């Protein structure tokens, strides 16, 4: 059983619920695999329809079919999608993404406000009886609108903790002031902001310099109480993906990964097999070669 740090803004009456949710997300390992499904807003239809993308992916339900048959910690997506499809996928572990913006809003100075508040998510969880394990929110560090998003994120973390809900913050350097959003030193700084906000987990993009020094700067910024997840990014070579995740988690000490396109831009059978191979690396400590054999077997 993994030892859980319970933040002091969790009420005594909600601590066991928070602990159960953390254990469900991490499968009692302290590590986390998020299946990211917020891109239908973030990337519009770019990720879901094209010559190299299976037609399966054009249907929003494809994400739910994958999530329902894969060993993920949680499926992160918008509440509206969960409300539409959740009755058919009631066993899926969900993380509600509270804000999203389309990629038509460029990086000059992005702003993404919350669509719902935590109280509404808690009410939805109670009424729907779905397995809502947490909430998520993106902060664009460096944007002119940073102050507004940081304030909103702080309120979300506090309110979520009051409900016993863990919080995953997407911490992305963006804006005219940012010269290189993939700079490891800058990403580590964004982690600092997320930790100060009280996030339980922080999702960041990979640095452009993938040396151990760069990764360690980012991961160390999370300290001992905040888990760092690296995004998978655009679809990549299978061996590279598995090797990268293993290295990030089991050599450098990251908490896990959040993958979207690398999973859902496959047929249903292939997507489920790939998700379970990633889970074997993150949760079971399987080597990339063993995970690849598992994938090919399925």
Question: Each PLM stretch: what is its role?
Answer:
Residues 1-43, 87-91, 215-216, 294:
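N-terminal amphipathic alpha-helix/helix-capping segment at the start of soluble metabolic enzymes
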Residues 13-22, 59-62, 79-81:
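Short alpha-helical segments and helix-capping/turn motifs at coil-helix boundaries
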Residues 37, 79, 206, 232-233, ...:
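Short secondary-structure boundary segments
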Residues 209-210, 233-238, 263-265:
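Short Gly/Pro-enriched loop/turn and capping motifs at secondary-structure junctions
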Residues 250, 264-298:
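C-terminal helical cap(s) of enzyme catalytic domains, especially alpha/beta-barrels
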Residues 256-266:
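Short acidic/histidine-rich active-site segments
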